[in-house]
Amino acid sequence: MTADVPNARLVDVELDESIGRSTPDVEHERAVAIFDLIEENSFHPVGDQKGGPYRLKLSLMESRLIFSITRENGDAVATHILSLTPLRRVVRDYFMIYESYYQAIRSATPSKIEAIDMGRRGLHNEGSQTLQARLKGKIEVDFDTARRLFTLVCVLHWRG
């Protein structure tokens, strides 16, 4: 996928802070997703032959998801604007099951927690695949990178 491009990876991810903060649980998910994303990712803007490493700023504007990509030194690489419409249902469903999961871990039986978690993971996978498909032809990412990016899309959506 990105074997011919040097340093096809992210070294920094920033979320639009103008949207504000969310619940402590959501902020924890954000922090973990960013940490994991920076630790291990495969990220290459299609058509960029210079390679990375890259910085990514994710933001929302008028129901659109904006990927602003620069090199590590700040030089602009690309900006991609995606409609949130294809992700809206899965984000909404994921948020509902996410809330159920966090309520369950405080009081439910282990089997109920496991069942909810399986549903949560399934929706997360669906959202990750949808995001990866939406990025096709714009940004090449592997599945694990798409999963972490989907978490951040959810965080932005929950804040906004």
UniProtKB/Swiss-Prot annotation:
InterPro entries: UCP032146. Pfam families: UPF0262. It comes from the Bacteria. Belongs to the UPF0262 family. NCBIfam families: PRK02853.1. This is UPF0262 protein BSUIS_A0274.
